[in-house]
Amino acid sequence: MTAEKREAKVVLVDIEGTTTSISFVHQVLFPHAKENVEKYLKEYWENEETKQIVEDLQQVPQYADYQATLSAPPAVVDVKVIAGFVRYLIDKDLKVTPMKTLQGLIWACGYASGELKGHVYEDVPDAFRAWQKAGLRIAVYSSGSVDAQKLIFGYSVAGNLLPYLSDHFDTHVGHKQEQQSYVNISNSLREKPQNILFLTDIPGEASAALSAGLQTIILHRPGNGPLSDDQKSNYEVIPDFKSLYSLQLPQK
């Protein structure tokens, strides 16, 4: 089935490499979090939300790996220790839920101050408008926290796009290359899997969604990773959302 002829009730979009350039995430957002994590922790160290994040960070398996990189085990878990661990996770692009939550809080300060603006491709607002007009729901599934998702779309270069979005999912629903995550999303949306179209740039995510019964299309935007010949033949691949402007609800 070609993109132009597809029907769906829900469009489920990934962010990085799909609605938003990978370079924005890796060259703007991640460095901003790295540069500001220590400042943020110092300011909000006694905040209950921060305390919970710090506790959760110490429970993840990667914390032991990080400690092994230190010259000596820290005598106390302080701002510098946790900030160092967060920078370690960012450098290794490890998608750890409490770290993602902390990143979202740091970015919130950056967006509120006007230092950050969420990047979206030019075709994204047009697609959102077309899908909403056609009666489709639009949901987001990203490894970034729900709060971080809302910041990108709420403070985007195209203005506030949140009114177009009905639902947000992050790693609390499961990891993106696991079939069960998409089953959980379908259940949460109260929609049959075959009525959900998932748009992503990662073949492993497309495979997991497909195995759960969702429709899938891979976005191959500028700067995205290369696709093998097998991946190009196994999945529908499109360069942008323009061929999906005409997406409609299933005909009864």
UniProtKB/Swiss-Prot annotation:
Binds 1 Mg(2+) ion per subunit. It comes from the Eukaryota. GO terms for biological process: L-methionine salvage from methylthioadenosine. SUPFAM superfamilies: HAD-like. It is found in: Cytoplasm; Nucleus. NCBIfam families: enolase-ppase. This is Enolase-phosphatase E1. It comes from Drosophila ananassae (Fruit fly).
